[in-house]
Amino acid sequence: MKVLLELLLGYSVLILAHELPYLPSTRHPPKEELPYWCTYVKNCDFCWDCQNDICKNKITNESISINSIVNCRVTRDSPSQSCFYEISVKMPNHHSMECSHPRPYTGNEIFMEKWGGGGDYWPIIIRHCCFYLVFSIAFVGYIVFVYNKNLHLNTTMKLLALLSILIWLSQPALNRPLSIFYMKQNLPRTYTPPVRELEYWCTYAKHCDFCWTCKDGMCKNKVFRDHPIITQNDYIVNCTVSRWHDRCMYEAHFRIHYQHNMNCSQPKDLEWFIELKRHVINQDDL
């Protein structure tokens, strides 16, 4: 096993010994780079061949259950030599690293191995709720303690810093950042944006599937009630949306992959799709 790991590491170094070309966001990195990516995110779907609910590793021939496999995306930016991978389970996680100094993705490892890409994720939600409850009780208790003891500011700040460190150390157990801190600033890449944001996304990416409710081949817009009903194959595509502070992005996933970045405060319509469907797309292909 040790020899195998050394070979994988050596192969990874060889891959990174020359300037790597740009790798767009993709679920399937080049075959020659599989040892590199599969060393650091070994549960990603592109590392495995699955048959009859049993998956065999393409690199090590190791076998695991299909329930432990998750969908992943990998990206590499050549100028900055930064590598990025996203683990898309019930609650997506993102990880950036230097391509020449990669790090295994340990923060979500337990979650992947135990819950995989399917199954019931209520235990994770319950764990988060319990943590928030304990954190709230601890915070209130801390305020009461400081008030009763009449502590000086210096001591108060030390205790607050200690509490913050404890919260930070608890993150690996929660498998994701505290959503209460990131909810407004960062929207993970997801197929279904929050309901409160549907009007925003469906205004500029109106052909995305999350904007429509379809039944018996007919689709009704979720946001604009006066929008005419359309047929289910009338240019509705799977979409992914993301938001980082003031930068928003949506991707359309179908025969031709498209990614569009925009300023969140100055969004642009998905105009390319109108021309594309007019000249290229056949409804039977969607």
UniProtKB/Swiss-Prot annotation:
- Which membrane topology term applies here? Multi-pass membrane protein
The transmembrane residues are 1-17, 128-148, 153-173
Q: Which GO terms describe its cellular component?
A: host cell membrane; membrane
Q: Where is this protein found?
A: Host membrane
Residues glycosylated per entry: N61, N238, N263
Instruction: Write the record's keywords in alphabetical order, separated by commas.
Output: Glycoprotein, Host membrane, Membrane, Transmembrane, Transmembrane helix
Which InterPro entries does the protein's record reference? ASFV_fam_110
Family, per the entry? Belongs to the asfivirus MGF 110 family.
Known role? Plays a role in virus cell tropism, and may be required for efficient virus replication in macrophages.
Q: What is this protein called?
A: Protein MGF 360-3L
Protein species of origin: African swine fever virus (isolate Tick/Malawi/Lil 20-1/1983)
